[in-house]
Each structure stands twice: as structure tokens, then as C-alpha cells.
Amino acid sequence: MSTEKPVIGIPACRKRIAPHMFHAVGEKYIAAVANAAGGVPLLIPALGGSVAIAALLKSLDGLLFTGSPSNVEPHHYDGDASEEGTLHDPHRDATTLPLMAAAIEAGVPVFAICRGFQEMNVVFGGSLHQKIQDVPGKMDHREDSSKPLELQYAATHQVRLSEGGLLEQLLGSRVIEVNSLHSQGVDRLGERLVIEATADDGVVESFRVADTSSFALAVQWHPEWQVMKNPQSLALFGAFGDACRERARETRSHDLDSAVV
């Protein structure tokens, strides 16, 4: 059995720092891939159509789609124009949306968090509430940015896991406490997506892709935050890492067989 660690791609956000544009990924995501999933993180620049997706996927054993301060541009799901001042990242959209679709179809394990969760819904034809706190009957799922990070990322509400679903199998519970740092949320659920968890106000908090043999899970909360201190978050990243290792074994075994032939 190979002892090599799986290579896990993490698409970057594009942002301005001083006068220059940078491609960046939050350290907490990189650390979660390395320490909790047991993979080798590979940062993928947000180059849109310049990314050679087919070639890239041959080099990857998994993909983590992260959260971000930016929102998916609404034209991707036929939504109304965003309010002035809304932060968008069109270069990330142009990279992650086609990359995620291709990865899932190719059987590459995918774990999507927060913005990544929203991207997965859009990829499968779903739509988003841009401000879920303004929807009647929904609670405010945003963090209080005036508080220290420890409090912003603290658990704030429960989510109920679908009976017999993947999350219940992984976490051994029907109810868990999660943090909440989002304004966008699922409006219309995408095709092929199966709900794995909901908040008490009915907001979808997790789903998986139904008809794929590989790991393809998305959560609205942030399990990457202090992941090594949270058994439930460790279980999620552990399952993702296991799927990536299995993908790596299958791919390398196939490559060896091809070389022998």
C-alpha cells in the first residue's frame, strides 16, 4: 500500500493587497487539509479559463472549496443584481464553478465549505438568497464582526442531520452545534443534491451529491476552524482525507497497470 499523502487542491480567491492583485487561501483551510485530512495542500490560482482543468484533475486526489468574504455573482443562478458594495470575485467564480463540476463528474473527492457550499448548489442549477436574514421566518446567520474571532467562530445554533444520511453516519448524532458566518443561503436546491442537515429555521446547512461514487459533500458552517480541537470537524476532514487517499491508490494503481502493459 502506498504511504504517499494525497494531493488536495484548494482554489484561491483573488484579492487586492496594496496596489497588487494576489491569489490567496486562508491558512486555516491549508492547515486543515495538511493536519486533519492528512493531505498535501496545492493552491490553485483563480485564473478562470486559463486553468487547464482536465490536466489539473489528473494531478489531484481531492479538492477543497473554501469559504470567502465574497459572494457568487448572481447572474450564475439568474438572481437579481447585488446591492452596491457587495463583494464579488468573478475570477474565483470562473475557476471554481467549472472546476467543481468537472471534478465531481470525474470522481475526484470534493469537500465544499461556506462559499464552496453555495458554489456547489449553483453548479447543480440551484439558486441563492443573497441576504437570508431578510427572508421572512429565517434567522440571522451572520457573525458579529465586532467580536473576537474566537467568538465569531463559536457554535451559535443547532443543525438537525438527516436520518440515515452521510453526516449522521460520520458523526453518530442527529443534532450538532455549528458556527454560523454567512449571509447567502440556499433558495432553490440544485438537482442531484440531497439534504444532509437543516437549521431550526429550515435553512439548508449541508447536502451531498446523490449519484456519484465519490465523496462530494458540502456544509454551510466552518469545520476548518480549530479543526484539531473539534471531534465532529475532525470526522468530516478525516472522511474527506480517506476518500482522497482511496482516490490516490486507485489512480496510482491504474497508472502502474498501464505502465506494465
Question: What do the predicted segments below correspond to?
Answer:
Residues 1-111, 122-124, 129, 133-171, ...:
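N-terminal beta1-alpha1 cap of cysteine-dependent amidohydrolase-like domains
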Residues 114:
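Conserved G/P- and acidic residue-centered "switch" motifs that form tight phosphate/ATP-binding loops
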Residues 117-119:
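Hydrophobic, aromatic-enriched interface-forming segments
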Residues 213-215:
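A short, structured beta-strand/loop element
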Residues 217-220:
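Active-site-proximal beta-strand elements of phosphoester/diester hydrolases
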